[in-house]
Amino acid sequence: MITAEKKKKNKFLPNFEKQSIYSLRYDEMQDWLVQNGQQKFRAKQIFEWLYEKRVDDIDDMTNLSKELREVLKDNFTMTTMTTVVKQESKDGTIKFLFELQDGYTIETVLMRHEYGNSVCVTTQVGCRIGCTFCASTLGGLKRNLEAGEIVSQVLTVQKALDETEERVSQIVIMGIGEPFENYDEMMDFLKIVNDDNGLNIGARHITVSTSGIIPRIYDFADEDIQINFAVSLHGANDEIRSRLMPINRAYNVEKLMEAIHYYQEKTNRRITFEYGLFGGVNDQIEHARELAHLIQELNCHVNLIPVNHVPERNYVKTPKEDIFKFEKELKRLGINATIRREQGADIDAACGQLRAKERKVETR
């Protein structure tokens, strides 16, 4: 729930007349009900309507009194976004472009795997991290999303899956934006979707990825939550990583690795390193050896990413044979590594591409 204190801490949060009902954690809903003269147990009924029955209107919550429904309508909205574009790939990947209440647009992607359906969610409108290979940063950062706007992305995808009696089985927070720059709303989102009364998606089926906001890595390590953790690394030395990710100038590789070691010591959980391969930049055998040396003491996995071409960027794809050689060298050196399967190559698949193509309000 967005409080005055939260708004003071997070200047990039929106200032809507009514906040999303999906922004409330279960405990916050209970507290709000009591503060408004209602019975605490109504929280369970409301969450059932929101996350199990997935109604679109507060008036559809028929086991609530008319008085309570009116109070809810006076204080909250259920409409946080509308679908503007829905692109479906030959491989079943679906990319959604949503328009928010203030006209900004965000992307969400449904990816189908043998093991289930994964949703990639966005945490910010735009991004200020400035990765030189990413379309998401082209328009800069406009604002942070409320927790409810992040929840609504998953719910909208789930409602689409309801038509074929499927369910969202995994969530990855790897869409537009840097999750750790919207930390409190991201944490509320995680608690809502993980809650037994919410979407009840297991913590081990949710992954958060960061570009390396070091103070927040320490905070995340201290959270009592079993969420999977990934780091966008892309370079094993400061020269290459700073070229690809300017944030490395503020949080260099040495300091980043110190934070990652702290995280693993505190949580005893495996870490995933996202490593995009860029032709002629970071994709040679010597780069694989340098990467292996950097992470050899960690319980980790390397996810090698054949990068999607972004028209506004100049990077080229690494040839397939070089990708396989890179993976083979990591494995020879004892590093667990896999190559990410390319999905949605025919539908503006790179993060931020669809939004960049359709963006109107943001570019005024």
Curated annotation (Swiss-Prot):
SS bond list: C120-C351
CDD domains cross-referenced by the UniProt entry: Radical_SAM
UniProt GO MF annotations: 4 iron, 4 sulfur cluster binding; metal ion binding; rRNA (adenine(2503)-C2-)-methyltransferase activity; rRNA binding; tRNA (adenine(37)-C2)-methyltransferase activity; tRNA binding
Domain of life: Bacteria
Annotated cofactor note: Binds 1 [4Fe-4S] cluster. The cluster is coordinated with 3 cysteines and an exchangeable S-adenosyl-L-methionine.
EC number: 2.1.1.192
Residues holding [4Fe-4S] cluster: C127, C131, C134
Keywords: 4Fe-4S, Antibiotic resistance, Cytoplasm, Disulfide bond, Iron, Iron-sulfur, Metal-binding, Methyltransferase, rRNA processing, S-adenosyl-L-methionine, Transferase, tRNA processing
Residues the record marks as active site: E107, C351
Cited PANTHER family: 23S RRNA METHYLTRANSFERASE (PTHR30544), RADICAL SAM CORE DOMAIN-CONTAINING PROTEIN (PTHR30544:SF5)
Extra remark: Reaction proceeds by a ping-pong mechanism involving intermediate methylation of a conserved cysteine residue.
Protein name stated in the entry: Probable dual-specificity RNA methyltransferase RlmN
UniProt source species: Staphylococcus saprophyticus subsp. saprophyticus (strain ATCC 15305 / DSM 20229 / NCIMB 8711 / NCTC 7292 / S-41)
Gene: rlmN
